[in-house]
């Protein structure tokens, strides 16, 4: 039997090993110069003014919501078809997640769905740039500006994604992820970009115990060794070990995403003759980062259910993913919002399947997946 082909695998090489070795030998392994370099690199990538590296995108979402003073009595609009961490952070702060439906074929939250969900209690909107494609962020941001509501872009899938010629996060506030399956990774990590100087200042405090400066600031700039707590905060800083890996990966981003795109194109060409439905691409000008390649497996159309397909692929040594089970169908949120109905979200959540897609995949790997899909179509 062939070696198991995972759904995802990080592309690590000698450059990442050398970057870690350099940090370990430097004597400064926690938040330090590599963090600063990573933040500067993301400002350059996105064109935004401020970047704040954090221990995860979830941590970034937590402190961004906190900095916006979102809490009990507030509502935050976001799709249900997203990773549950966003809903969890909203709920843990005492606010109410208002989950809205997505477009049936792009799986993007729409401006119309967002605007129809706004109430006097709405405090923030969190659109998701899904699977590596961009949401219609100009239209969504215009709604936020019209109603005076903050927009926080969930850009966890969007390192290397462009919308109308601009990298995601070029303006406003966006949160990126460096988790192990993302387009660039440092195992765990995240980063917030923003053009709001006051928000950036608050985020830096909240990510490091509520202190006005961190240890590297104090050493570098000679500030008082007894840093003062300005507000209660968290331990969400990123180590320089992680930052060094992320920097090395960022330097490879174009190469990594180009290979993802080539594998995605190979899938697209083959699927044209198969009943499995890939996602539609957004109509607006964009560059897709191809974080995920998702098909919809409708049993009536394909002759096999999604779950049966995933199991059959596993038996053939091929891994798959599910991105995502709709959050409002999870036990906690199902019991909290028992009457919530999101038809497009639910239809897709029962049928979506993420195929293997990662930079070290070969065309032969993709052919193996395609051959298996051809064999299973109609079963």
Swiss-Prot record:
Enzyme Commission no: 2.6.1.87
Any one Gene Ontology molecular-function term assigned to this protein's record: UDP-4-amino-4-deoxy-L-arabinose aminotransferase
Domain of life the protein comes from: Bacteria
Enzyme class: transferase
CDD domains: AHBA_syn
Gene3D superfamilies referenced in this protein's UniProt entry, alphabetically: Aspartate Aminotransferase, domain 1 (3.90.1150.10), Type I PLP-dependent aspartate aminotransferase-like (Major domain) (3.40.640.10)
Pfam families: DegT_DnrJ_EryC1
Cofactor entry: pyridoxal 5'-phosphate
Pathway(s) it belongs to: Nucleotide-sugar biosynthesis; UDP-4-deoxy-4-formamido-beta-L-arabinose biosynthesis; UDP-4-deoxy-4-formamido-beta-L-arabinose from UDP-alpha-D-glucuronate: step 2/3; Bacterial outer membrane biogenesis; lipopolysaccharide biosynthesis
Catalytic activity reported: UDP-4-amino-4-deoxy-beta-L-arabinose + 2-oxoglutarate = UDP-beta-L-threo-pentopyranos-4-ulose + L-glutamate
Keywords noted in UniProt: Aminotransferase, Antibiotic resistance, Lipid A biosynthesis, Lipid biosynthesis, Lipid metabolism, Lipopolysaccharide biosynthesis, Pyridoxal phosphate, Transferase
An individual GO BP term: lipopolysaccharide biosynthetic process
One GO CC term on file: membrane
N6-(pyridoxal phosphate)lysine, modified sites: 182
Family matches, as SUPFAM superfamilies: PLP-dependent transferases
Assembly and oligomerization: Homodimer.
Job description of the protein: Catalyzes the conversion of UDP-4-keto-arabinose (UDP-Ara4O) to UDP-4-amino-4-deoxy-L-arabinose (UDP-L-Ara4N). The modified arabinose is attached to lipid A and is required for resistance to polymyxin and cationic antimicrobial peptides.
Family according to the record: Belongs to the DegT/DnrJ/EryC1 family. ArnB subfamily.
Protein's recorded name: UDP-4-amino-4-deoxy-L-arabinose--oxoglutarate aminotransferase
């Amino acid at each position: 039997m062939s070696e198991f082909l995972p759904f995802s695998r990080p592309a690590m090489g000698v450059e990442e090993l050398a970057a870690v070795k350099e940090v370990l030998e430097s004597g400064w392994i926690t938040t330090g110069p590599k963090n600063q370099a990573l933040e500067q690199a993301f400002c350059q990538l996105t064109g935004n003014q401020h970047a704040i590296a954090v221990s995860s995108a979830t941590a970034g979402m937590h402190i961004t919501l906190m900095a916006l003073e979102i809490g009990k009595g507030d509502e935050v609009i976001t799709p249900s078809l997203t990773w549950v961490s966003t809903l969890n952070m909203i709920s843990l702060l005492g606010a109410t997640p208002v989950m809205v439906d997505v477009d049936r074929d792009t799986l993007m939250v729409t401006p119309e769905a967002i605007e129809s969900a706004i109430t006097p209690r709405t405090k923030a909107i969190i659109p998701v740039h899904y699977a590596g494609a961009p949401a219609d962020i100009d239209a969504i941001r215009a709604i936020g500006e019209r109603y005076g509501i903050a927009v926080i872009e969930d850009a966890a899938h969007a390192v290397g994604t462009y919308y109308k010629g601009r990298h995601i996060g070029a303006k406003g506030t966006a949160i990126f992820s460096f988790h192990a399956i993302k387009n660039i990774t440092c195992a765990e990590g995240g980063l917030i970009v923003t053009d709001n100087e006051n928000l950036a200042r608050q985020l830096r405090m909240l990510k490091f115990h509520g202190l006005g400066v961190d240890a590297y600031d104090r050493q570098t700039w000679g500030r008082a060794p007894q840093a003062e707590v300005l507000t209660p905060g968290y331990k969400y800083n990123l180590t320089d070990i992680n930052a060094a890996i992320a920097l090395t990966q960022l330097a490879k981003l174009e190469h990594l995403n180009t290979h993802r795109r080539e594998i995605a194109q190979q899938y697209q060409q083959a699927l044209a003759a198969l009943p499995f439905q890939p996602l539609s691409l957004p109509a607006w000008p964009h560059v897709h980062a191809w974080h995920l390649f998702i098909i919809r497996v409708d049993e009536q159309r394909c002759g096999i259910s999604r779950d049966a397909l995933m199991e059959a692929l596993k038996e053939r040594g091929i891994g798959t993913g599910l991105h995502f089970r709709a959050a409002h169908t999870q036990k906690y949120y199902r019991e909290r919002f028992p009457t919530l109905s999101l038809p497009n979200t639910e239809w897709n959540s029962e049928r979506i399947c993420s195929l293997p897609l990662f930079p070290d995949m070969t065309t032969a790997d993709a052919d193996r997946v395609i051959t298996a899909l051809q064999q299973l179509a109609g079963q």
